UniProtKB/Swiss-Prot annotation:
Annotated GO biological process: chaperone cofactor-dependent protein refolding
GO cellular component, one term: cytoplasm
GO molecular-function terms, A-Z: ATP binding; metal ion binding; protein folding chaperone; protein-folding chaperone binding; unfolded protein binding
Family membership: Belongs to the GroES chaperonin family.
Gene it is expressed from: groES
Quaternary structure annotation from Swiss-Prot or TrEMBL: Heptamer of 7 subunits arranged in a ring. Interacts with the chaperonin GroEL.
Keywords: Chaperone, Cytoplasm
Cysteine disulfide links: none
Subcellular location, record wording: Cytoplasm
Functional summary from the UniProt entry: Together with the chaperonin GroEL, plays an essential role in assisting protein folding. The GroEL-GroES system forms a nano-cage that allows encapsulation of the non-native substrate proteins and provides a physical environment optimized to promote and accelerate protein folding. GroES binds to the apical surface of the GroEL ring, thereby capping the opening of the GroEL channel.
Upper classification of the organism: Bacteria, Pseudomonadati, Pseudomonadota, Alphaproteobacteria, Rhodobacterales
Protein name according to UniProt: Co-chaperonin GroES
């Protein structure tokens, strides 16, 4: 099933966190927090301003993002648990450090 978010909403797949700490300790599932990083799966067309013009989205499909701990609504699409949230719930886009240094 294809899913297209409306307006300024984005569909996000959570990116799982590490299962070990830097010191080598294994973190049990019960102690893990839900990750606040995700991969943008789909984006809406953008909200409309007062004149009815579309406001372009800052994120695009494939962006790795950081969002608030309680952001979004959990939805199931094709048996996969995803999040749908407004673009304003996204705190930032995570870029590859090597690519950022080259720019």
């Amino acid at each position: 099933m294809a899913f297209t978010p409306l307006h300024d909403r984005v569909l996000v797949r959570r990116v799982e966190s590490e299962e070990k700490t830097a010191g080598g300790l294994i973190i049990p599932d019960s102690a893990k927090e839900k990750p606040a990083e995700g991969l943008v799966i789909a984006v809406g067309a953008g909200a409309k301003d007062d004149d009815g013009d579309r406001i372009p989205m800052d994120v695009k499909e494939g962006d790795k993002i950081l969002f608030g701990k309680w952001s979004g609504t959990e939805v199931t699409v094709d048996g996969e648990e995803l999040l749908i949230m407004k673009e304003s719930d996204i705190l930032g886009i995570i870029t590859d450090e090597a690519a950022a240094k080259a720019a």
